[in-house]
Curated annotation (Swiss-Prot):
One of its GO terms (cellular component) is endoplasmic reticulum membrane. This is Cytochrome P450 3A15. The gene is CYP3A15. Gene3D superfamilies: Cytochrome P450. Induction: P450 can be induced to high levels in liver and other tissues by various foreign compounds, including drugs, pesticides, and carcinogens. It is found in: Endoplasmic reticulum membrane; Microsome membrane. It is a peripheral membrane protein. PROSITE patterns: CYTOCHROME_P450. Its EC number is 1.14.14.1.
Amino acid sequence: MDLIPSFSLETWVLLALSLVLLYQYATYSHGFFKKLGIPGPKPLPLFGNVLSYRKGMWSFDIECRKKYGNMWGLYDGPQPVLAITEPDMIKAVLVKECYSVFTNRRSLVPVGFMKKSVSLSEDEEWKRIRTQLSPNFTSGKLKEMFPIIKQYGDVLVKNLRQEAEKGKPVQLKEIFGAYGMDIIIATAFGVNVDSLNNPHDPFVSKANKLFRFDFLSPFLLSTVMFPFLTQLYEMLSISIFPRDSLKFFTKFVKKTKENHLESNKKQRVNFLQMMLNSQNFKDTESHKALSDVEILAQSIIFIFAGYETSSSTLSCIMYSLATHPDVQKKLHQEIDKTLPNKAFPTYDVMMEMEYLDMVVNETLRLYPVANRIERMSKKDFEINGMSFPKGTLVMIPSFALHRDSKYWPEPDEFRPERFSKKNKENIDPYIYMPFGNGPRNCIGRRMALMNLKLALIRLLQNFSFYPCKETQIPLRLSSEALLQPEKPLILKVVSRDETIRGA
């Protein structure tokens, strides 16, 4: 049997030419860093280095940092990515040249109207949206929301107690995830849900769908290998965000605006209402106010950015406390002394609790939700005396820097004392960046810390946490783009007494 197809000479020539052109496309940019004398891992045709992310970006970045030093080059498909680790370089990218060169993140996947969100918008549009949103995240506005957060802190305690009373080790992800979901939906939309006990609530089910995608899926890999497909997908209205979820939230925002215009009643404070309030006549006439589509995009991105952050970070904090009983005891003591008899904290008192702050900061050092910080250059630029063209992606491997022995003695150890008032002064703000840095840092930083700290206080007022045989020690991290434990965290939870105030 003839295994070689019987093609004409012209067909063979065309096939050979196609293969040559495909190879050239697959490798055309892969000599970029070699010409500049910048070391880095060898890329594969078409894929670049993305297949090395299968064990986790964080793991790959640590290996590269050890092997190549302060700067290296890699490739996401054909896209050159320059990794930098020196604080002066990082400051130049995130702060000094933020508005002139490094304003934007990269546009990698099709996102539809979500391009209007503060996280994904670009240039002057981003500056306008950020300016409109910033007043909603001041400490004054967060204090207005604090009663809502306290309410869900008590729901968290009640849900955890119900599980703990069964006498079995508790899987914490579902409970912490519900806390994160409840707070995000309440503060973003003003809607009360109890997502743990009402998983079929449309808000809960539609919001949960927003997180169901894999960064190494064929769909997303296609945009990495063939960046031009992103524009094609956008033209075809194909997005990484599920259409039914977007449709649901679109209807809700539209209905809320109609009610907002018709009602003179004072609404419970939430981000959606605050954004609608900002649509005043003066700003609308000057085209500075947020449009309806922009308000919708911000509302959805709050869910996307806030949910996984709170649930994963809470899990990592509880793991760290359970495996370091001395730290847990000390934090119990601070909470009991500051808030005797399980008193509710005020916003100001909570934010002044020093050891609580140390524990949260050290956890965010060890387990930053985002592995990397990225900025796309919109002009030619220089770093370290070398010139780079427009379109070079600059990447800061924040996880690798948080675990770098150059800056942190015994970097894999959980030591809250690193963030004491005495030691905090020695921490470089361009090495420790759990929320990024510069004008484009995380706008929800204060909100995230408030949610985490209140949850910690309410949990530790009522419970102690211990490892059990089902606890994975040491904690292994998943390969997901957003950092989280490889397996759901399971701990033994013991009530400190039989009294729960308000729960």
